Amino acid sequence: MITPLDFIADLFNPSLAFLPRALAAVLLASVVTGVVGCHVLMRGMVFIGDAVAHSVFPGLAVAFVLGGNLMVGGLAAGVVTAILVAIFSQNQRLREDSVIGIFFAASFALGIVIISLAPGYSGSVQDFLFGSIVGVSNEDITHAAIMGAVILLVLWLFHRQIVTVSLDRESARAMGLPVLALDIVLYVLVTISVVLGLQTLGNVLVLALLVIPASAARLACRRLGSMMVFSPVFGGLCSVVGLYLSWAFNLPTGGTIVLSMVAAFVLVWAVTAIRSRARAQLKN
């Protein structure tokens, strides 16, 4: 069995250069999705992570048929779909999750139609959708770091306004806030953060990083600011543990990281439940 010390030594082994790159990729994703996930959870649109992964398909299909860059094609399709969802969600008679489902289902269907016209598509497109964390390049890390910094900067600049819209849209409109523009900003940021992680981490791991750490933070913290600190730390620690376990026992990396997060979430849930019960007994 590979011990934690052996794992640390392997991280500095030049012949295993893919291992520290995989660790860097998952840690960067943990930080970005940890913060973005808090907004997603507060907004009640947990479904969006999986939906975005499907919405990129038309862009992937067009990029593949034309011989273009899959990342650029997927990102363009995801952003366009996100903007359309934000616009149509302004109708108060439509639930936001309903609009998400309609547009992202349509996007995926369109992608299937386009890609079916091109033979030999399965390999490269599947790599994008399901990820290859051990195949992360230095260029992938650089791109993720730059875009992650941009996402966090924009969220920091518009934090108060986005939170206000998420909590009470009518009050936000009464205050004169540009609700549509802020919706577009949030949707586009979520889309970019998900698409950036798809090619390296895959759909399942990105969705887990978007939802599980933020949910654990919601249980453990009372304030949004504390959640946005707890969530990335939770995701990062679980990712390190999951990567170690997958390396030590020769298990699938993405699945092991997800299971590590689920186990940690259950632990947080149990601890908070016990703590809440103890407080209730003290009050009585």
Label for each model-derived stretch:
Residues 3-15, 120-136, 244-247:
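Membrane-interface helix termini and inter-helical loops of multi-pass transporters
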Residues 17-26, 124-152:
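Loop-to-helix entry region at the N-terminal start of transmembrane alpha-helices
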Residues 38-121, 217-229, 246-250, 272-274:
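Short loop segments and helix-boundary regions at transmembrane helix junctions
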Residues 204-255:
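Transmembrane alpha-helical segments in multi-pass inner-membrane proteins
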Residues 251-284:
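Cytosolic-side transmembrane-helix boundaries in multi-pass membrane proteins
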